[in-house]
């Protein structure tokens, strides 16, 4: 769970689902300062690297933007190699005195791989194609896993239903979602 400091911006839910040669990343739009909602329509899911990569962040907003910029530069150095770019970012994040203090997590995905990147240097690929981060992450993850094997439901529907459940339960997650999709 994210620690709360009334002077920092925290809390969100980011969910990634990979199924049938498609991947979606969805995130809510709420930004909280302590226990107060200060923005409801933030865009925490973005496309990077010429739209071939989707990234979503949870945690301190300014820290996440710093990480987006760093990841973009790593992707420029290692085009088409998302895993390598993420490992390089995680190394910097863990080793650099300034970056080490950043309080955020990221989910990144391209057409072939989805990864969770943490500030402790972890670069994790979910076993089942479903990953979630943020204050409502466990709610969204549970809901997505429950829905993923149901026939006739699209990957976007799964993502939206899971985020609705997370938004209904987590006070730091709202229903204003941004969803991005990559298909093979």
Swiss-Prot record:
CDD domains cross-referenced by the UniProt entry: protease_HslV
Membrane-spanning parts: none
Q: Pfam families, from UniProt?
A: Proteasome
Q: Please give the Gene Ontology molecular function terms for this protein.
A: metal ion binding; threonine-type endopeptidase activity
Can you tell me which residues form the catalytic site? Answer: 12
Name the EC number(s).
3.4.25.2
Any one GO cellular component localisation term in the record = HslUV protease complex
Q: What is the protein's major site of localization?
A: cytoplasm
Alphabetically sorted, this entry's keywords are: Allosteric enzyme, Cytoplasm, Hydrolase, Metal-binding, Protease, Sodium, Threonine protease
User: According to the lineage, what is the superkingdom?
Assistant: Bacteria
Report activity regulation: Allosterically activated by HslU binding.
Residues binding Na(+), per UniProt: 167, 170, 173
Some GO term, biological process aspect, for this entry: which one?
proteolysis involved in protein catabolic process
What is the catalytic activity of this protein?
A: ATP-dependent cleavage of peptide bonds with broad specificity
Gene3D superfamilies, A to Z: Glutamine Phosphoribosylpyrophosphate, subunit 1, domain 1
Q: Where in the cell is it found?
A: Cytoplasm
Entry-linked InterPro entries: ATP-dep_Prtase_HsIV_su, Ntn_hydrolases_N, Proteasome_sua/b, Proteasome_suB-type
What binding partners and quaternary form does the record give?
A double ring-shaped homohexamer of HslV is capped on each side by a ring-shaped HslU homohexamer. The assembly of the HslU/HslV complex is dependent on binding of ATP.
For this chain, the family text in UniProt reads: Belongs to the peptidase T1B family. HslV subfamily.
Write the protein's name.
Answer: ATP-dependent protease subunit HslV
